[in-house]
Amino acid sequence: MSKFKILSMFSSAGISETYFEDIGLEVVVANELVSERADYYRRLHPNTNMIQGDIVDKEIYDKVISESKKCGVNMIISTPPCQGMSTLGKKQYYNDARNELFWHTLNAVEDLDPDFVFIENVPKFLKMKFQYSKMDLTFEEILNEKFSDKYVVESQILNAKDYGVPQSRPRAIIKLYKKKYLWPWPKKEDKVVTLRDAIWDLPSLESGEVSSIQWHRALKVSDMHREVMSHTPEGKSAMTNEVYYPKKKDGSKVKGFHNTYKRMKWDEPSPTRATNNYMISGHNNVHPGREREDGTWSDARAMTLREVIIVSSLPLDWGIPATLTDKEDKFVRLLIGESIPPLLSKKIIEQILIANEVNYEKL
């Protein structure tokens, strides 16, 4: 019998759950709104009961709760979509329908009475305020108002690079756990894994080139992008080049920030892999490259999907198709860009097993 029976809310493709089975966790029920993401979840987690539909719909919510009760769910993981808090002001947060999704996590905690709850989101989430009982409170404050008699409520911002992931990706983590249990935070690793450690051995590729290595193929880039990035050194942005900078069709310079059209650094972790990680013009998206004898730089491209998989701590035997079209490649990148690196979620949750000496079933 599995020690944990988990409900995964707002699960997308379930990337954060990749290593759960390795530590004895069983996700028995999952819910995702978007059918394309739900289908991918079923591909990656065929043994989980995926209930596709809008959790705001009472029929869907009731089905999720009913199936969770049948399966004996004792843990909830929840990653509500965070787009609604990226650029809006405080009053707009209250009215953004996407932010109503947080309340369904609270409802599920009330209805299922789990022993553990794991909530993760963008760092800004911890400071965001909601209206609750005529007060403006953070989500953590609301959790304490509702559940502090039964649960310990804790939060931190953890960066994946501190826990063995070759990517700098800070995430807001909120934990709820019943007071008879322990759930410490994971300790930081002594060594940071760099891009040199992670992807140096992969062969160089230019625009449109394909290697014999699975998922190591370069998406095509424009001639202009290839030219400007081949004249941009490791760690630098083409926006600062005096001659070879991004241009519009009329020859004028493209407007952009200092971290656009920018190469990464070999001796640092990858910057955060966002959903647009295939775009040269995105933030810190370009391969570090290697200097050639003529002074130009190789790999004038974004990371290949294989490189994104590696820096996101996903396994190289991951269950996605071996061959992907460009559209499919970009969709998988989108899924990865939306997700917490799975090694980080594993290290956070396995602390329950370690701290309670794997005696969870006896408590």
What are these regions (language model features)?
Residues 27, 115-116, 270-272:
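Beta-sheet entry/capping signal
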Residues 2-112, 123-130, 134-136:
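Core alpha/beta nucleotide-donor-binding catalytic domains of modification enzymes
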Residues 223-363:
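C-terminal target-recognition/interaction regions appended to catalytic cores
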Residues 63-70, 82-260:
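Class I S-adenosyl-L-methionine
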Residues 20, 146-148, 352:
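Hydrophobic alpha-helical packing residues
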Residues 9, 30, 163-167, 262, ...:
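Aromatic-acidic/polar surface patches that form glycan- and anion
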Residues 13, 136, 171, 338-346:
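Short alpha-helical patches at coil-to-helix transitions and adjacent helical residues
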